[in-house]
């Protein structure tokens, strides 16, 4: 009986050790963060009349709900709320932020457009001929693109139509250093007088991606027609390297869409500092 008890205890300890080992592996990422999302898809008509134009707002807000470090969780939520909805909502709970933002968007839409729509109705006999630009929309969708040890890459996709020929859309990235509890900037990654050398690397990579050999050839395609090609703070880190993300109009016309330029770490070794996050990504 005693022998059976000892054997059973050994099995229990062995299984427990295996489970704790699994948990350690699962929680190897700083903060052991767990995420949820708040989703909204709401349509509201002018004058609350379904026969009239409407606005549509879509939100999918990803945020941390649990962490082994509450200060880290709260800090991330502050950055994410600010980036998605603006500084005025900092300090509010995520659920309340999304609720208030949705209500404010609808309220401002009606306040701004109802007087103009009323005037248009007076001037035009056929209500259906009133411009479609009264139908507004806004989308804010975010997600965690990468969560690896001390790094969390957070992407925000934004699109909006407020009348005119077309809407506008853009993506914004936050590369969160989870030990410092703040976003990484280029100065945290590169050392010395890196900007000119990094600019050359971006031009060279763009030429390689587009199979041309000169700056002029790129310019003929539309690159650098709306802004200078230079390192942007809108970038994201990955195991492949650093990707610089240029939204529409940053360096190209709307018709060309956004531009991504990925520079492998090996091409930038002479410019990189000793940030531990880079070492983890390169391993």
What are these regions (language model features)?
Residues 22-283:
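Compositionally biased intrinsically disordered regions enriched in Thr/Gly
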Residues 1-34:
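Bacterial Sec-dependent N-terminal signal peptides
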